[in-house]
Amino acid sequence: MNEFQEKLVNFAWPEPKKSYDVVIVGGGGHGLSAAYHLATRHGITNVAVLERKYIGGGNSGRNTTIIRANYGIPEAVRFYQHSLELYQKLEEETGRWLMHQEKGILWIAHSEMGIKQQRARAEINRAFGAKTDFLEPEEIKKIVPEIDLTGGGKYPVRGASYNYEGATARHDRVNWALAEGAMKKGVHVHQRTAATGILKEGNRVIGVQTDKGPIHAGIVMSAVGGHVTTLAAMAGLRLPIRTHPLQAYVTNHYQRTFHPIVASADLLSYVSQTARGEMLMGAEIDRQPSYSYRSGHHFIQSLSYRMLAMLPFMRNLRVLRQWTGVCDMSPDYSPIMGKTEVENFYITTGWGTWGFKAIPASGEQMAEAIATGETPEMIAPFLLSRFKRDRPMADRGSAGTH
């Protein structure tokens, strides 16, 4: 039991009330962040967070903890840079050590096309607030002495974009710090409480049916990861979401400090070092949509082959454990946030492989939308209605792995 859990054990864990001003379904990072910001920024504390398992027990506790802002479209760069800056202040704001560590993230280019893409990424990042430059191979070698610039003779390192403020933070500490901050203000967090239906009157949501009984609400927000289409269907809403498994694995301790996060868009892979010195690696989503949390040996083989081409020192490491989460992917590889066509039903979803890095900004912006009834300018491009208006936020090149 960590210090968060020890302290939270002493909090009151009341039974669900019959009604709340706001009910948030999903007790992961996005749901807890919205509750935290409703309470701390807007004084709205008659809020319930419903979690069918335990706090952070879903994808918020399965991600690889990378924070970055080096996206490929202006709207995304602004949003994720804002979230990155909120992360930088979150330890001071919550009074909790979140193990936030600024490392920088390299996106390697292996071809002429890759060089053009990473140069363009650096330019658009700088134009919209993210600190990113393009680096030549010799500059990359200074940052990552372990890298093989020949790429094993198959994937030569031709350059990279470098997002200086790329970072990591401990996911469970982020989840529990937000939960603690919300609960201190009076928010109710109900673990082991599953949403089994949405209560409606006509086209207006009036509450949530749970396995512990009905709970009425002025506003219901879905912050579900994985089974969001099922919950949305209960509200009469069809979402353009497909859910795919995403695998990762971690090795034993590597004694030297491997400082940056290294990613390759061409190889669809990335690696960072944990606080314990382990090498943490991930790759692209599984192609077949599924809710399965099973991991496969083929993933280890395929990813290891790609990573060893760039970082041959890892051939002496051993795999300690492997796991799988699930990702809700939208057609344009961008999130879906804000109001829906169903009255009083808000949604934050489509976070794919990039949900952890968005937790502070997503919660802040969703809280503002709920508190004011207006869509904040920052998330207006990410409304669900963009698909009907044929205004996609296409950013597949930035969001395939992490």
Regions found by a protein language model. Give the residues of each.
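Glycine-rich Rossmann-fold phosphate-binding loop(s) that bind the pyrophosphate
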Residues: 27-30, 52
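Glycine-rich FAD pyrophosphate-binding loop
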Residues: 39-60
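Dinucleotide-binding Rossmann-like beta1-alpha1 core, especially the glycine-rich loop
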Residues: 64-146, 268, 298, 306-308
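Flavin (FAD/FMN) cofactor-binding and adjacent substrate-gating region
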Residues: 89, 101, 110-185, 190-191, ...
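Central helical "cap/lid" subdomain
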Residues: 210, 214-259
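Active-site lid/adjacent beta-loop-alpha segment flanking the redox-cofactor pocket in flavoenzymes
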Residues: 253-346
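C-terminal catalytic lobe of FAD-dependent flavoproteins
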Residues: 308-402
